[in-house]
From Swiss-Prot:
Entry domain remark: The FZ domain is involved in binding with Wnt ligands.
Organism of derivation: Homo sapiens
Tissue: Expressed in adipose tissue, heart, brain, skeletal muscle, pancreas, thymus, prostate, testis, ovary, small intestine and colon. Highest levels in adipose tissue, small intestine and colon.
Function: Soluble frizzled-related proteins (sFRPS) function as modulators of Wnt signaling through direct interaction with Wnts. They have a role in regulating cell growth and differentiation in specific cell types. SFRP2 may be important for eye retinal development and for myogenesis.
Chain coiled-coil ranges: none
Residue ranges annotated for the NTR domain, each copy included: 172-295
Cysteine pairings via disulfide bonds: 40-103, 50-96, 87-125, 114-152, 118-142, 172-245, 175-247, 190-295
Secretion signal span: 1-24
Biological classification of the source: Eukaryota, Metazoa, Chordata, Craniata, Vertebrata
Molecular function terms from GO: endopeptidase activator activity; fibronectin binding; integrin binding; receptor ligand activity; Wnt-protein binding
Name the record gives this protein: Secreted frizzled-related protein 2
Family classification: Belongs to the secreted frizzled-related protein (sFRP) family.
Length: 295
């Protein structure tokens, strides 16, 4: 679970809440790479961190000491936002080589990430983590991994076992920056069921979606249509299919947001999100539009 202010790892990414979950990963202390004999297990479809990796089987225990798939799933989700931040094209490869190390039937030895792979990812991603107050964890220090050889996972340029650099993920439709005029804003407000000014308390990932829990005392209601006060008391909004796209618009857990959306199947689904910046011309226009809203 991703916790509120002061602990987000890089939500759509990047904001303090995910790092709160990442802390759980660091509590294993120093990893011991001399594990008992590993077993090959199919990579589950709900291991979103390694979705699309080009091998089917992983070793348990893994290189982080997780002995059950439940542990892997609980800890891996916190790192998805770091991958989506695209601080390095091989971030997923590096993390998956630890969370879900490749398992080959004819090889008993666990294949670790190469030292150079770790160094490259650390050099690019550690500053991103540091910006949110979290240092690169000791358990991932690159000196723990072997120098480049045939029995370690190298950078994409020389590796054929794991996928090469992926295309940059698309921007989530709800998070696209649209330069709307007043009429466009009015139309957007009218076609949605709710418009709220919110602050985020907590964020979690469920399957392909993002569940956003609101700070109840920091919520301003601008419009409700078919949405009851009871619906809002749940203080839960959803950003659908968000693990397949990025949302840089929503990358600060401490910022207020204007969100609009629709009620779908009993859930409040976000269709538009904008960071609320007091005094910004666009939000003055939005405020005027809300005050004279007539749908």
């Amino acid at each position: 679970m991703l916790q509120g202010p002061g602990s987000l790892l890089l939500l759509f990414l990047a904001s303090h809440c995910c790092l709160g979950s990442a802390r759980g990963l660091f509590l294993f202390g120093q990893p011991d790479f001399s594990y008992k004999r590993s077993n090959c297990k199919p990579i589950p479809a709900n291991l979103q961190l390694c979705h699309g990796i080009e091998y089917q089987n992983m070793r348990l225990p893994n290189l982080l000491g997780h002995e059950t798939m439940k542990e892997v799933l609980e800890q891996a989700g916190a790192w998805i936002p770091l991958v989506m931040k695209q601080c390095h094209p091989d971030t997923k490869k590096f993390l998956c080589s630890l969370f879900a190390p490749v398992c080959l039937d004819d090889l008993d030895e666990t294949i670790q990430p190469c030292h150079s792979l770790c160094v490259q990812v650390k050099d690019r991603c550690a500053p991103v983590m540091s910006a949110f107050g979290f240092p690169w964890p000791d358990m991932l220090e690159c000196d723990r991994f072997p120098q480049d050889n045939d029995l370690c996972i190298p950078l994409a340029s020389s590796d054929h076992l794991l996928p090469a650099t992926e295309e940059a993920p698309k921007v989530c439709e709800a998070c696209k920056n649209k330069n709307d005029d007043d009429n466009d804003i009015m139309e957007t407000l009218c076609k949605n069921d709710f418009a709220l000014k919110i602050k985020v308390k907590e964020i979690t990932y469920i399957n392909r979606d993002t569940k956003i829990i609101l700070e109840t005392k920091s919520k301003t209601i601008y419009k409700l249509n078919g949405v009851s006060e009871r619906d809002l008391k749940k203080s839960v909004l959803w950003l659908k299919d968000s693990l397949q796209c990025t949302c840089e618009e929503m990358n600060d857990i401490n910022a207020p947001y204007l969100v609009m959306g629709q009620k779908q199947g009993g859930e409040l689904v976000i269709t538009s999100v904008k960071r609320w910046q007091k005094g910004q011309r666009e939000f003055k226009r939005i405020s005027r539009s809300i005050r004279k809203l007539q749908c």
